Amino acid sequence: MISTAQSKTLLGLGASELERWAVSQGQSAFRGRQLHDWLYAKGACDLQDITVLPKAWRASLQDKGVIIGRLKEQDRKVAGDATTKLLLGTDDGETLETVGIPTDQRLTVCVSSQVGCPMACRFCATGKGGLQRSLYTHEIVAQVLSVREVMERRPSHVVFMGMGEPLLNIEAVLDAIRCLNDDLGIGQRRITVSTVGVPRTLPRLAELAMERLGRAQFTLAVSLHAPNQSLREELIPTAHAYPYDALLDDCRHYLAITGRRVSFEYILLGGLNDHPAHAEELADRVGGFQSHVNLIAYNPIEEEEFQRPTRDRIEGFRRVLESRGVAVSLRASRGLDQDAACGQLRRSRQK
């Protein structure tokens, strides 16, 4: 159920919740089912657009301040590869970015979980502006609906890899996953939650997911970005509070609770963490997990002078991991020409 602070917002509620809510408003459960259809299938943005509802009831809801909870598009950038970045505004005046990443076979939506981010990873633009607040469930779901509306395609995949640290907003993220799965028909196995790691939260995520979702079939992607603690602290300031071994232990705990393997992410920074010796060290760390490692070539941001690795360095790093029996892939940098790639999202319109 939505929080008290958002009790007049309908987006994020499931079919049975909308039925109960309609009855509580003196209407039939059928009106709740109509609302569900218009919120999720038809993508209504305003209650006054739902003309199948009685006009008097719509007016009454408007007087009470009841809203759907959609976000307002403030800017749009379309890259040469058709990746689309949206700057969206919230009801309280905050802004966030979300990205639609299309291929012939799928449409992936990269959603934000917070306005800004407190983790301050040196290679990421989002953390440069700090954290304003966490997003509500409806604000996460609304991002997917905005991308669907703009790109005129049904999203097939959702990745929590936009602005913010999802594990600092666990309850809203899990409620959003429930809504995306049940109400928008996006399978859990097509949803990925990415985290840089927050102490003591992975076991809690596992337990809450089992409790709220009945199962935890979404993919958990843990961002390592370094093969050892000292280099990780250099790149991720908050890592000093979360020793590497403790993070990996929590990954094992997550696997034990959910039965789902953890995948790992590693951003390659030219001349800093992309040496074959780093790959060997990383293989030592993650080899026992039988997990997948996703390599990401650094995407430039204005505030830092990190270098994108050469193709030879990337392939060399990959070959070392593969020679050690580690499953590995390289993520394509989509939307790079419009600052829509991994690590480039911000809270405000960019010139």
From Swiss-Prot:
Single GO MF descriptor: metal ion binding
Organism domain of life: Bacteria
Active site (UniProt): 97, 342
Cell inner membrane is among the record's keywords: no
Main location: cytoplasm
Catalysed reaction equations from the record: adenosine(2503) in 23S rRNA + 2 reduced [2Fe-2S]-[ferredoxin] + 2 S-adenosyl-L-methionine = 2-methyladenosine(2503) in 23S rRNA + 5'-deoxyadenosine + L-methionine + 2 oxidized [2Fe-2S]-[ferredoxin] + S-adenosyl-L-homocysteine; adenosine(37) in tRNA + 2 reduced [2Fe-2S]-[ferredoxin] + 2 S-adenosyl-L-methionine = 2-methyladenosine(37) in tRNA + 5'-deoxyadenosine + L-methionine + 2 oxidized [2Fe-2S]-[ferredoxin] + S-adenosyl-L-homocysteine
InterPro entries: Aldolase_TIM (IPR013785), Methyltransferase_A (IPR040072), RlmN_N (IPR048641), RNA_MTrfase_RlmN (IPR027492), rRNA_lsu_MTrfase_RlmN/Cfr (IPR004383), rSAM (IPR007197)
Record bears the keyword Transferase: yes
General remark: Reaction proceeds by a ping-pong mechanism involving intermediate methylation of a conserved cysteine residue.
Record-given protein name: Probable dual-specificity RNA methyltransferase RlmN
Organism this protein belongs to: Synechococcus sp. (strain WH7803)
